[in-house]
A protein has these predicted regions:
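Conserved N-terminal segment of class I S-adenosyl-L-methionine
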Residues: 1-101, 112-124, 138, 142-150, ...
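Hydrophobic adenine-recognition pocket in adenosine-nucleotide-binding enzymes
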Residues: 105
Length: 215
């Protein structure tokens, strides 16, 4: 699997993610103001690097991905902020994070690992920014393209509520890569510590309920 995600692929990630992260992170950070973020399948770490920049380095970050990530392309500190992992295996971190990201990663893992992957994410945080490729989106090693309702059901089984607030806000923002703006969702664990009713009410006021749509 590492050979699939070669240097050329990782350079492409930088091109796709940088501009998108600059648009997405301010919205997400201002809404949740997390003090710590973990990214499952961080790639070259662009989203976490933008979190650090936007928070003036006040937010702790950890990027998780395979051992094929090129050290010189990584946008976060390789020694302190990156951990090489197998995303198809159970991942247990030293502590919970205030927010977890997983952006355009789930489609790269065989369907038999989907529940393990979601378990790892939900074990790590009560608030999740998630996106995964839709059927027909295609890409390098896309082996489990699914409509968003598939992932909503998996998070719901773990008592996470879906808030469709990202797509209405960014749907027509052409500074953001299409994959992100048509697939991003927020998931919040029900009755979680630190998730107050005011926040839930705000999320509900921003969301839609039309899940399985695409550009």
């Amino acid at each position: 699997m590492g050979n699939v995600y070669n240097r050329e692929f990782q350079e492409m990630l930088i091109d796709h993610a940088d501009k998108s992260a600059d648009r997405i992170i301010p919205f997400v950070y201002d809404l949740f103001t997390p003090n710590s973020v973990v990214d499952f399948g961080c790639g070259t770490g662009n989203f976490l690097a933008t979190v650090k920049k936007y928070s003036n380095n006040k937010c702790e970050v950890l990027g998780l991905d395979g051992n094929y990530i090129e050290k010189d392309l990584l946008q976060i500190n390789f020694e302190k902020e990156f951990m090489s992992v197998d995303l198809t295996a159970t991942i247990a971190l030293e502590h919970k994070y205030e927010m977890a990201f997983s952006l355009e990663v789930g489609e790269h893992l065989d369907e038999k690992y989907a529940d393990i992957f979601v378990d790892s994410i939900t074990r790590a945080s009560d608030i999740v920014l998630f996106s995964a490729a839709l059927p027909g989106q295609y890409g390098v090693h896309h082996v489990n393209e699914r409509y968003i309702s598939y992932w909503i059901e998996k998070f719901s089984d773990r008592q996470y509520q879906c808030f469709d607030i990202m797509r209405p806000h960014f749907w027509w923002d052409h500074d953001i890569d299409l994959d992100y703006r048509q697939n991003m969702m927020i998931f919040v664990k029900q009755n979680a510590d630190g998730v107050n009713e005011a926040l839930v009410g705000k999320l509900r006021s921003l969301e839609t309920h039309i899940y399985d749509i695409a550009h």
